[in-house]
Amino acid sequence: EWPLDPRWPYPQSKVETERMLEKERGNYPTAVLRIAGVYDDDCQSIPLAHQIERIYERHITSKMFPGHISHGQSFLHLEDLVDAIVRVLERRRTLPETAVMLLGEPEPLTYDELQHRLGRLLHGEDWDTVRIPKMMAKTGAWLQGVTPLLEDPFIKPWMIDFADDHYALDVSRAKEWLHWEPRHSLRDTLPKMIDALRRDPVAWYRAHHLSLPAELEEKR
């Protein structure tokens, strides 16, 4: 068991919920699924949608990153998540009383590979990324957030401290207990996401709650 050390409120709430379940479950068995970032064929992932938006619109910030570009985070296709939940229900009588499992793609795309793949899919070119100091990134995010007439940025100053995080998941428990492993991969699904964007950019932006750039406003 890797020690749990949540560093901001969202994961802290998950750890507190797990502890509450263990304390209050009584004689009822529990299955705790620690799920990676979920996406589908259209995207429907907040961080991925914003990353695609930045590269699609060629924002200068799309070329900058305040962390190790060789690091990455695990994701999980929605269909693989549904499959895992169904397997939990089907095998509930054979699982341990407290079954804790990680669900996600074991080998994450690095930030650098993700950038290059999106650059090639969107513009037919590699998308080189420059690592910038965290303080510079925090200052830029803060200025964008307080400057009148500028849109409130997705990336907030407090997020910068987590840019170096790397999540490669051990899904061996799910394999053993559920006979489950992901059938999809973010690497193979990215072309589908970009195809969905190209088919109807306005609808894609609206579905992901993104502000339309001027060129798309004209197509409304």
Which residue stretches match the model-derived regions?
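Two-component system phosphotransfer/interaction surface
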Residues: 79-82, 86-90, 187-195
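Active-site Tyr-X1-5-Lys
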Residues: 5-32
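Alpha-helical membrane-targeting segments
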Residues: 47-74, 126-166
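Mid/C-terminal beta-alpha module of Rossmann-like enzyme folds, strongest
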Residues: 87-155, 171, 191-192, 204-208, ...
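Amphipathic terminal alpha-helices
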Residues: 169-177, 181-220
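NAD(P)-dependent short-chain dehydrogenase/reductase
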Residues: 24-73, 78-80, 86-87, 118
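Residue-level signal for the nucleotide or nucleotide-sugar donor/cofactor binding architecture
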Residues: 8, 12, 73-79, 109, ...
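Generic structural signal for alpha-helix termini and adjacent loop/cap motifs
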Residues: 58, 91-94, 196-200
